[in-house]
Amino acid sequence: ADNRRPIWNLGHMVNAVKQIPTFLNDGANAIEADITFKGAVPTYSYHGTPCDFGRDCIRWEYFDVFLRTLREYTTPGNSKYREKFILFVLDLKTGSLNNHEVRKAGENVAKGLLENYWNNGNNGGRAYVVLSLPDIAHYEFIRTFKEVLKTAGHENLLDKVGYDLSGPYWPSLPSLDSVHEAFKKAGVDGHVWLSDGLTNWAKLGDMARLKEIIKSRDSENGFISKVYYWSVDKYSTTRTALDVGVDGIMTNYPYVIIDVLNENGYKDKYRLATYDDNPWETFKN
């Protein structure tokens, strides 16, 4: 058996459809997009300024068009299909929404995915989806999201969905206990991705938070399935992140991650994740 740790190589800030093949060609097996809301309505895949150094911050697409395009790349038999493209993270920009809007936003994102990505359950895209929310107080987004799929008779699609509650970042990050509490309130057991990171222009810290999350993931009663780190553009940082034990690395340069995964000392311990790797299972070696 192959007992190397599977790694998700996440293309960062992929918001225009033209960028999707570029990142996949560079070796990404997953992408992250920023979903911007007008009120409770997910409207664009768009980040805006400021963003990572060396990147165009204002590339965008309409949310429904973006999802339909993702579907093409992840539906076997489609001319655009890429077998290695196995997961995407929706970085949901719900920071300015009130509680009522957060609940509505959960419904709207579920409806959008159901119609435009899963094709109402009729041979839709097969990739796994991680819904990433910026505030643990927004756990009700997850509840209403799940409710919509259940009511529509597509509860099975929740097998493909994971969740990340990573903030707020200001004034200080929530404790892992309060993060766990929020997941319980959301009714989420398993299917948990947690992220930690810095913009690529920030000085690399001591990774204390990252190490704490990884320790929690690997503990006896850990609630975290996978841990990913962002945004990593350097060979040295990639090696450090892998050494610490991450499952995913979000990067502006996916080929850097591929290069490191092929290096001596790394290729015998890590490999690029494939569709057969369950993103909701904690890796045990």
Curated annotation (Swiss-Prot):
Disulfide bonds join C51-C57. The active site is at H12, H47. Keywords: Cytolysis, Dermonecrotic toxin, Disulfide bond, Hemolysis, Lipid degradation, Lipid metabolism, Lyase, Magnesium, Metal-binding, Secreted, Toxin. Transmembrane segments: none annotated. Gene3D superfamilies: Phosphatidylinositol (PI) phosphodiesterase. Its cofactor is Mg(2+). Mg(2+) binds at E32, D34, D91. The keyword Lyase applies. The keyword Glycosyltransferase does not apply. Its EC number is 4.6.1.-. It is found in: Secreted. One of its GO terms (cellular component) is extracellular region. It is an enzyme of class 4 (lyase). Expressed by the venom gland. Dermonecrotic toxins cleave the phosphodiester linkage between the phosphate and headgroup of certain phospholipids (sphingolipid and lysolipid substrates), forming an alcohol (often choline) and a cyclic phosphate. This toxin acts on sphingomyelin (SM) (228.2 U/mg). It may also act on ceramide phosphoethanolamine (CPE), lysophosphatidylcholine (LPC) and lysophosphatidylethanolamine (LPE), but not on lysophosphatidylserine (LPS), and lysophosphatidylglycerol (LPG). It acts by transphosphatidylation, releasing exclusively cyclic phosphate products as second products. This is Dermonecrotic toxin LlSicTox-alphaIII2.
